[in-house]
Amino acid sequence: MPELTHFDAAGQAHMVDVGGKQETKRIAVARGSIRMLPETFALIRDGNAKKGDVIGIARIAAIQGSKRTADLIPLCHPLALTRVKVDFELDETLPGVHCTVQVETLGRTGVEMEALTAVQVGLLTVYDMCKAVDRGMTITDVKVLEKHGGKSGDWVAG
């Protein structure tokens, strides 16, 4: 099993030194879903949610979340992101919404945490905008689907 990089020899948490790493293109894709009542799904699909355009606001929130990851996750490096692509898919059979985010940078460390944070913030925004009609919504299956770049190379979920 690989060693945990965020702990020093004494077991103390620290921010990993990435200064000696080469800058490479880094890409990560993450995805998650929010399940809801059919009536809530219909409000989103039909654009009738009282708070407005649920998907449009959630998309902006996801982008903002990716940019603020280092403020939320203590040992994450602040990164200059070069691209954040957010896709929402309405799924009537769930019923619910899937959120997929691709984050890119040219840097010394990966962007998995930024992609995961973006997905969570996007889905939390859907919850916030619809909680008045459906407090039982469930955010589920949030995970990294793939990552590219860096010393460890490419990885795709099985």
From Swiss-Prot:
Matching entries from InterPro entries are given as: MoaC, MoaC_bact/euk, MoaC_sf, MoCo_biosynth_MoaA/MoaC, Mopterin_CF_biosynth-C_dom
Q: What is its EC number?
A: 4.6.1.17
> Is Isomerase tagged as a keyword?
no
Q: Sorted alphabetically, which CDD domains does this protein's record hold? A: MoaC_PE
Which Pfam families does the UniProt entry name for this protein? Answer: MoaC (PF01967)
- Is Cell inner membrane tagged as a keyword? no
Q: What is this protein called?
A: Cyclic pyranopterin monophosphate synthase
What would be the name of the gene that encodes this protein? moaC
